[in-house]
Swiss-Prot record:
Any one GO BP annotation for this protein: tRNA wobble position uridine thiolation
Annotated family: Belongs to the DsrC/TusE family.
Gene that encodes the chain: tusE
Keyword tRNA processing recorded: yes
InterPro entries: DsrC-like_C, DsrC-like_dom_sf, DsrC-like_N, DsrC/TusE
Name of the protein this chain belongs to: Sulfurtransferase TusE
Enzyme class per UniProt: transferase
Species, as recorded: Sodalis glossinidius (strain morsitans)
EC number(s) stated in the UniProt entry for this protein: 2.8.1.-
Subunit structure: Interacts with the TusBCD complex. Interacts with MnmA.
Lineage of the species this protein comes from: Bacteria, Pseudomonadati, Pseudomonadota, Gammaproteobacteria, Enterobacterales
GO cellular component, one term: cytoplasm
Length: 108
């Protein structure tokens, strides 16, 4: 993937292969390619999954993401309907991709 004149290494599905390549600007480009216009709600989830990864060294699958979001932000944001509205192709799949993280293990 080329971004700002630099080749960024990704796997076959477009996930970054090097976490240190991530930036908010690159996240915006990945989101654009995913057909998502990032809002403050998207950024909250993106920063949440990055913090989750740094703490647990794993990208959260949907069930884990919903549970952790509910604990952190309450049931309004910690439910799959809310997350799927933000990331229609799958909150774990798209949020982790935009956040520059590896694809969750239990993600199809």
């Amino acid at each position: 993937m080329e971004f700002n004149g630099t080749e960024i290494s990704t796997d076959a599905q477009g996930y970054l292969t090097h976490l240190q390549d991530w930036s908010e600007a690159l996240a915006g480009e990945i989101a654009r390619r995913e057909g998502i216009t990032l809002s403050e709600a998207h950024w909250q989830v993106i920063h949440f999954v990055r913090a989750f990864y740094l703490q647990y060294n794993t990208s959260p699958a949907v069930r884990m993401l919903v549970k952790a979001m509910a604990q952190a932000y309450g049931e309004e944001k910690g439910n799959s309907r809310y997350l799927f509205r933000l990331f229609p192709e799958g909150p774990a799949k798209q949020a982790t991709k935009i956040a520059g993280l590896p694809k969750p293990v239990k993600c199809l």
